[in-house]
Amino acid sequence: MSKIVPYALIGVIGLAIVGLLRQRRRPIPTPPLLAFLFDNPLVEAFAGSELLAERLGLAPGMRVVDAGCGPGRLTIPFAKAVEPTGEVVALDSQRAMLEKLEHRLEAENITNVRTLEAGLGEWALDREAFDRVLLAFVLGEVRDREAAARELYAALKPGGILSVTEGFGDPDYRRPASVRREVEPAGFELVERFGGFPVYTLNFRRPENLAT
């Protein structure tokens, strides 16, 4: 706990800076310089990789999208969880974030991660190709959230899960009701809710194809 307190203080200051940077009409992603805000023991304590992997129901062989992956706090443990035949696509709109991740992948000799430089809503993901998609502290940074939801619906296999995790204190925090309004029109159905304050997760399923 003693190690968490300094990170909490730094986090509050950092989030305030991010908030000032985002006092504009359009959302912007977290700058690479402030990536540590979402890659530190404080965040791990409330939204750790093991906890989110459990909420996602990860299993070997799955294909997963870590959308807005940043420097890879979740990408790397998720890649290990889906080994040996699974794959994680690490998607981020910022090349600098992906470079941080690629250095970590090389250092740990992880080969089942594919990085993809693109924003949500740009339709860069393959159709009906993934079992799980994760949005952790990301949705509020997306400029067109409804378009992003449609893209992710198309990218998931029927029966696949979109998991949205949000944390109070994030300058782009989205309330559960807001998330549902932005995600469900794409065709998703809410199937699970975990946590509450300060961090919650909503799991949405793409329904199975109806028999004809």
Predicted segments with their positions:
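A short acidic, Gly/Pro-enriched loop at the edge of an enzyme's catalytic core
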Residues: 121-133
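Conserved class I S-adenosyl-L-methionine
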Residues: 163-186
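A short glycine-rich, Lys/Arg-flanked "PGG" loop and its adjoining helix->strand segment in the class I
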Residues: 146-161
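Core SAM-dependent methyltransferase catalytic element
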Residues: 186, 195-212
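A short SAM/SAH-binding and catalytic strip from SAM-dependent methyltransferases
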Residues: 131-144
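Class I SAM-dependent methyltransferase SAM/SAH-binding core
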Residues: 65-67, 71-123
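Helix-to-beta-strand junctions that scaffold the AdoMet/dcAdoMet cofactor pocket
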Residues: 82-83, 142-143, 156-158
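Class I SAM-dependent transferase core
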Residues: 2-59
